[in-house]
């Protein structure tokens, strides 16, 4: 690797520059850092969008874990995934296929001479989520996931026959989910083997891929829309595969129940659930969502999480460890811990587990014995920021990748007994777009809420001076079981909003996660109750205690449940405290909740079905006539056509009411976006309109000549008045 030039990615701290929407969107986005077996270097990918070329470029780099320097490994954007086979040997996915349109290829190469690799396999469809294990014979067993036909063959969209009719016919729900309409194809995990050749001959595909999921009727893995490689695992010896699937026997729109399945890599047996209703080891009364199966280093145990409730997606996750072949009840590990971890790894000796969990507005790492009793309290060994990935190094330390409110990429090493050991790289010291951002840009406070102390973040603007006053931005998060965390977001980034000339306050009210399950659960059938009280008390705390915040010219914004709360605030006394409101994809008409796709969510939140508990659905109705009569604050409504969680009719209904009531309002719509706005060009318009709207009514547009304006958007405005 010495033939490459290593580049330093450290830079001297400098005066912070305002983070503009353009900089937020075009700043390089890096993946997790994956170390090689020697622990000397780590590989990571980078992608970057340009508003000059209107294209995204991507490349792979190596990070020297000793010096923090990087070098480009390859500029080939078709390299989509990389897996280390040895200190220098790499297996990667080429997202194109020279022989099969719509297929992909597996290549083997060396990190020291990447361009000299060779094709080991041509796969007949699009696959991702590659995991691989070397066997004692030297063969490589691998798994990846793609789309499947009902008969188990891989689905290739480019080669599929286009139907003559666009009709869709359904006899059961789901009909649609998140942003897609369900069809007869589904996700499935496929297995394959790369056979090691003799002498100088390289690896080649041995036989055909095997579908490990399709033999189980109605199973699917990974489960869309957010499922991925964490939904399955390959044992270190390559013999077994574990995968998660929703319960095949239950209506998928009504239950969150899912099981962990175990199947031989060679598909010689049909996958069986280890925690299904008829499995001998299933813990009594545990019927909720299962997740994150991970094999132990010697492959004889499997760690995973499961929730208790079969209709509650935000129930507390509990860690379980299954012994392969055992018929005993699967034991929980630290089962009483009042946190909900969502990632797990075994230490190399198989005695300890490392888990990642939301905790007090962060995502931290904790360690615990693999056989810990239920009353054990896991120990945290990371602090600020939010961990997104972690890998063991040869010295038993962990290479951690994360982010914070002030950086979109942070790499460091840590150990359970020592905490953070060494900082290796951080984007705010690398990228000109994030130049000078740092921990001093944020603070936090607690205040007395409806029934307990509530946490809130404070994000300061560029060149903040506490002797001055800055208008308030009041951020309300979605979920509702979610939180504002010390982590980077390219969609709702409080620093980008603050740098228009505001102080952003982002509270974690009733319903928030990471502060104990009681706070999370307390929002059930209470959407406009305790959370609203918390927000009122937060506003009052800011008004009375933060002298540098101008609450007389404040604004509020929120998405999803946060959009609902903005709609609720519009008809409440708190709405008169703000100069402008921004509601993104929020529910407005109580009776429209039945049009969502994940019916378990609304039925659990409001304690019953739409017909049995109608009063509960209507209790917190922003569209109630008496509330509409209070609407007065200028409001931007954002809603997109492919949002099937909260259909676009919700936003249109709200806009219609605002217009007819004479409230200054604007409707922003994206026909090709879902619950989120992710296309870079659309994201720029989203930021220009949202920031331009609040700047207009807060007065920032006049006080800050560099502030974003509604006129910055090149899209024409339709106005027949």
Curated annotation (Swiss-Prot):
Pfam families hit by this protein: PD40 (PF07676), Peptidase_S9 (PF00326)
Post-translational modification: N-glycosylated.
Enzyme class: hydrolase
First-listed, main subcellular location of the protein, grouped into a coarse class: secreted
Gene Ontology process terms (BP): proteolysis
Region (Disordered): 271-297
InterPro entries: 6-blade_b-propeller_TolB-like (IPR011042), AB_hydrolase_fold (IPR029058), PD40 (IPR011659), Peptidase_S9_cat (IPR001375)
Compartments where found: Secreted
Biophysicochemical property: pH dependence: Optimum pH is 6.5.
Highest taxon, organism lineage: Eukaryota
EC number: 3.4.14.-
Tissue localization of expression: Expressed in mycelia and conidia.
Signal sequence, renumbered to the chain: 1-18
The UniProt record lists the keyword DNA repair: no
Keywords annotated in UniProt: Glycoprotein, Hydrolase, Protease, Secreted, Serine protease, Signal
Residues with attached carbohydrate: 75, 94, 151, 254, 380, 450, 607
Record-annotated disulphide pairs: none
The keyword Signal belongs to this UniProt entry's keyword annotation: yes
UniProt similarity note: Belongs to the peptidase S9C family.
Alphabetized PANTHER family for the sequence: DIPEPTIDYL-PEPTIDASE 5-RELATED, SERINE PEPTIDASE S9 FAMILY MEMBER
Cited function: May be involved in metabolism of dipeptides or may affect host defense mechanisms. Has a substrate specificity limited to the hydrolysis of X-Ala, His-Ser, and Ser-Tyr dipeptides at a neutral pH optimum.
Name recorded for this polypeptide: Dipeptidyl-peptidase 5
Organism: Aspergillus fumigatus (strain CBS 144.89 / FGSC A1163 / CEA10)
């Amino acid at each position: 690797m010495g033939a490459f030039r290593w580049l330093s990615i450290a830079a001297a701290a400098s005066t912070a520059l305002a983070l503009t929407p353009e900089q937020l969107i075009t700043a390089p986005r890096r993946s997790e850092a994956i170390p090689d077996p020697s622990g000397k270097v780590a590989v990571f990918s980078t992608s970057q969008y340009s508003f000059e070329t209107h294209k995204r470029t991507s490349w792979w780099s190596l990070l020297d874990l000793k010096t923090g320097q990087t070098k480009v490994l390859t500029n080939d954007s078709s390299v989509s995934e990389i897996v280390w086979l040895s200190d220098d040997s790499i297996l990667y996915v080429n997202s194109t296929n020279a022989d099969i349109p719509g297929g992909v290829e597996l290549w083997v190469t060396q990190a020291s001479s990447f361009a000299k690799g060779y094709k080991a396999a041509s796969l007949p469809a699009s696959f991702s989520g590659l995991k691989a294990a070397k066997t004692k014979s030297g063969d490589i067993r691998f798994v990846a996931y793609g789309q499947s036909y009902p008969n188990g063959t891989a689905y290739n969209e480019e080669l599929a026959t286009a139907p003559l009719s666009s009709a869709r016919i359904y006899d059961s729900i789901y009909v649609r989910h998140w942003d897609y309409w369900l069809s007869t194809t589904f996700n499935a995990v496929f297995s394959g083997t790369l056979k090691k050749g003799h002498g100088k001959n390289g690896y080649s595909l041995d036989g055909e891929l095997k579908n490990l999921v399709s033999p189980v009727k109605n199973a699917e893995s990974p489960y869309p829309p957010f499922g991925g490689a964490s939904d399955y695992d390959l044992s270190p010896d390559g013999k077994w595969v574990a995968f998660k699937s929703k319960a095949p026997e239950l209506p998928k729109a009504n239950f969150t129940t899912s099981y962990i399945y175990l199947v031989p890599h060679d598909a010689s047996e049909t996958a069986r659930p280890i925690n299904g209703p008829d499995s001998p080891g299933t813990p009594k009364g545990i019927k909720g969502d299962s997740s994150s199966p991970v094999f132990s280093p010697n492959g004889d145990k499997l760690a995973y999480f499961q929730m208790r409730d079969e209709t509650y997606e935000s129930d507390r996750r509990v860690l379980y460890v299954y012994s392969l072949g055992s018929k005993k009840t699967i034991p929980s590990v630290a089962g009483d811990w009042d946190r909900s971890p969502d990632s797990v790894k075994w230490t190399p000796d198989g005695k300890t587990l490392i888990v990642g969990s939301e905790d007090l507005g962060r995502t931290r790492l904790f360690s615990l014995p693999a056989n810990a009793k239920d009353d054990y309290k896991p120990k945290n060994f990371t602090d600020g920021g939010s961990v997104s990935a972690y890998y063991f190094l040869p010295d038993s330390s962990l290479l951690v990748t994360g982010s914070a409110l002030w950086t979109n990429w942070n790499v460091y090493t840590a150990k359970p007994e020592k905490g953070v050991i060494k900082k290796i790289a951080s984007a705010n010291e690398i990228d000109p777009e994030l130049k000078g951002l740092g921990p001093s840009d944020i603070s936090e406070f607690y205040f007395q809420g409806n029934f307990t102390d509530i946490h809130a973040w404070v994000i300061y603007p560029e060149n903040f001076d506490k002797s001055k006053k800055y208008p308030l931005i009041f951020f309300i998060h979605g979920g509702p079981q979610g939180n504002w965390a010390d982590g980077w977001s390219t969609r709702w980034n409080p620093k980008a909003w603050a740098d228009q000339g505001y102080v952003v306050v982002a509270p974690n009210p009733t319903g928030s996660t990471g502060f104990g399950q009681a706070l999370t659960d307390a929002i059930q059938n209470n959407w406009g109750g305790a959370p609203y009280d918390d927000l009122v008390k937060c506003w009052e705390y800011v008004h009375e205690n933060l002298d540098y915040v101008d609450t007389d010219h404040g604004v509020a914004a929120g998405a999803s449940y946060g959009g609902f709360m903005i709609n609720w605030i519009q008809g409440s006394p708190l709405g008169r405290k703000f100069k402008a409101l921004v509601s993104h994809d929020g529910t407005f008409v109580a009776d429209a909740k039945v049009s969502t796709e994940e019916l378990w969510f609304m039925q659990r939140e409001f304690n019953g079905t739409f017909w049995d508990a109608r009063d509960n659905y209507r209790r917190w109705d922003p569209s109630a006539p008496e509330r509409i009569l209070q609407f007065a604050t200028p409001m931007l409504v954002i809603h997109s056509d492919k949002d099937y969680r909260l259909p676009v009719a919700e936003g249109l209904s709200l806009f219609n009411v605002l217009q007819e009531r004479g409230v200054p309002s604007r409707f922003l719509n994206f026909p090709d976006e879902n619950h989120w706005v992710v296309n870079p060009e659309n994201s720029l318009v989203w930021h220009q309109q949202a920031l331009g709207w609040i700047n207009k009514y807060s007065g920032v547009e006049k006080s800050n000549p560099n502030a974003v304006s509604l006129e910055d958007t090149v899209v024409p405005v339709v106005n027949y008045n």
